[in-house]
Regions:
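Alpha-helical transmembrane segments of multi-pass membrane transport proteins
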Residues: 2-602
Length: 602
């Protein structure tokens, strides 16, 4: 499947099946231009949607119409399309996008995904619901390699869906789980939206590597929530099959003990030897009392060695300072091709060239959208829209938590109508300055933005994963919407945790990167950032011999001008540029103006 689908929009409503809706849209498109300039622009957008114009065309025409209507067509130099196109060439980070897409597409067609599934089943298949859990963690692992949500759905869903249904899991649960878990691809680094967010957010200097690290916590929370639902479904399935509840609870308790083995080591409380002993005891217990097989784990790990090493090599190299995100993306392409073509022998070079062609098509459509969206951002800045929004929000006297609640509601609605990349280009420039004015960390806001639009992958009418899964599983769109509905509710709970627990993302990300400093704010949204500067009458902090110990700027200037403290100054103090001053003649202290005049300062 071509990745270019990521930038398309839902088909225009067809008159035959949706005639009332179609007629309403046509009337709106024809009538809105009579309502003024804003109506003209809205009419252009709705008219394009009725005609089925692709997304890049809608955004491009929206931008062009906005500039023509508000600035006039006689000033072509004011149109920033060409300048924005040239400016994208200066964004080195942008090169990582097609490279990560290439590597993900190569692995999706190869055998890496199947080997990851085998390893996950060997590790956690013995837990109630373990087969479904293995699908979740295979999605997490594959997402950490490919960075693409639709690619994760296709790669893992194609192999796990028949297996889960055959094992007794309901079809609706199976399809909903695989479609929803696949959306973790945009939250687990490396992630395409995480690469683009620092480019779009012009209010702060954000490192892509720090944003990557900040995605681990929220991604892990979502994965654990899905795994817990799998455990509950697994226990219920076993009870329906007449299996006693006792063993399920025992196995679940053993599974919960696994993090206890490793957390003290990660927290610096235990060394490798202590952890090794605890892990050995843990493995012996579960192997003797459950269906777990350590030998099977080793066998599947050996078979999937190159797949397991991949994320370690990519992310470890980034966080270890070996290479930056762009270099890691280039390395991922070389690694994927070498493994799938020459080690696994699952692909030929002709297959790889086909993947590269598809990636080129996707990148071309993406760049058109980026140029149009960034140009529209230029229009919004020219009309001072972000500043007006900031003033409007500040006038509402919202607390940060209230603003984040409002943002979540807006973005959930946006996710239903726009794909994630387009939503980022349109709404980040509008909302980021407001978040900055309220003191919300730019990285935290970026993670919240991405989690919201991750849910948008599952919501109609343009939820991309719904269309991908509908095609993959050969089921109607209505079936897929019902399948993902319970998982959307679970993800909303995870969204609340991410929103109101900043340390889950920001704290963990900076801990991983060893950076305790917040991103540098470049463009303050309002004058509020300047209010924090010290007043010019504040103390300078330099101690001297005056009675108060510390002099303010005003006091020092007054002393220079009026000679409060001192009488005569040394002759050397009166020398400027090696010349004698008039201070020697009359024995007085020079004023500040006289000193500047003597120094030749205008």
């Amino acid at each position: 499947m071509s990745t270019a689908a990521a930038t398309s929009v839902a088909p225009a409503p067809k008159p035959k099946g949706n005639l009332p809706i179609f007629l309403v849209l046509v009337l709106l498109a024809l009538g809105l231009p009579f309502l003024g300039k804003g109506g003209i622009i809205a009419g252009v957008v709705i008219g394009c949607a009725v005609l089925g114009v692709p997304l890049f065309g809608i955004i491009g025409l929206l931008t062009l119409a906005a500039f023509v209507v508000y600035l006039g067509a006689d000033q072509p130099n004011e149109f920033p399309l060409i300048e924005r196109s040239r400016g994208l060439g200066d964004q080195v980070t942008l090169l990582a996008v097609p490279l990560f897409i290439m590597s993900g597409a190569v692995m999706g067609r190869g055998e890496i995904s199947s080997r990851l599934i085998d390893f996950a089943r060997a590790c956690i298949g013995w837990i109630p619901g373990g087969l479904a859990m293995s699908a979740v963690f295979a999605c997490v692992f594959f997402a950490a390699i490919s960075g693409s949500s639709p690619a994760t759905v296709v790669a893992i869903g194609a192999m796990m869906a028949p297996t889960l249904v055959k094992a007794g899991y309901g079809e609706r649960f199976t399809h909903g789980l695989l479609t929803s878990a696949g959306s973790l691809g945009i939250l687990i680094p490396p992630s395409i939206p995480m690469i683009l967010y620092p480019i779009v957010n012009q209010t702060a200097v954000i490192q892509v590597e720090t944003l990557f690290a900040s995605g681990f916590g929220p991604g892990g929370v979502m994965a654990v929530i899905f795994a817990a639902s799998c455990y509950a479904i697994g226990v219920r399935k076993n009870r329906q099959e007449g299996k006693p509840l006792g063993p399920d609870l025992y196995r679940g308790l053993l599974a919960l003990l696994f993090p206890v083995v490793f957390y003290p080591f990660l927290d610096g409380g235990l060394g490798m030897l202590e952890v090794g002993v605890k892990l050995a005891v843990y493995l012996v217990v579960i192997e003797k009392t459950t269906d777990f097989s350590f030998r099977q784990v080793l066998r599947s790990a050996g078979r999937g060695f190159w797949a397991l090493v991949f994320p370690v090599a990519i992310l470890g190299g980034i966080y270890g300072g070996i290479y930056i995100a762009v270099e890691a993306a280039a390395f991922s392409v070389v690694y994927a091709v070498l493994v799938e073509v020459f080690i696994h022998r699952a692909l030929t070079m002709r297959d790889v060239l086909g993947v590269f062609r598809e990636t080129g098509v996707f990148l071309g459509s993406l760049l058109v959208i980026m140029v149009a969206a960034l140009s529209f951002e230029e229009f919004l800045e020219a009309r001072d829209v972000p500043h007006m929004l900031v003033q409007w929000i500040e006038g509402m006297n919202l607390e940060p938590w209230q603003f984040l609640l409002l943002v979540n509601g807006v973005l959930l609605l946006v996710g239903m109508a726009m794909d994630i990349l387009s939503a980022m280009f349109v709404f980040v420039p509008l909302l980021a300055p407001i978040a900055n004015a309220l003191g919300i960390d730019p990285i935290h806001f970026g993670i919240i933005f991405i989690v919201n639009l991750e849910i948008g992958y599952l919501t109609p009418p343009v939820g991309l994963n719904l269309f991908v899964a509908s095609t993959l599983f050969e089921r109607p769109l209505g079936h897929m919407i019902k399948s993902v509905a319970p998982f959307i509710l679970l993800m909303l709970g995870g969204l609340a945790m991410v929103t109101y627990w900043p340390d889950l993302s920001v704290g963990l990300g900076r801990h991983i990167m060893g950076d305790d400093e917040a991103p540098v704010v470049e463009v303050p949204a309002t004058g509020g950032a300047l209010e924090e500067l010290p007043d010019e009458t504040e103390e300078t902090g330099a101690e001297d011999d005056v009675p108060d110990g510390v002099q303010s700027l005003e006091e020092m200037m007054r002393e220079l001008e009026m000679g409060e403290e001192g009488g005569d100054l040394d002759d050397d103090a009166g020398d400027l540029d090696g010349e004698e001053t008039d201070a020697e003649d009359d024995g007085r202290v020079l004023s500040l103006e006289e000193m500047m005049e003597a120094a030749g300062v205008e």
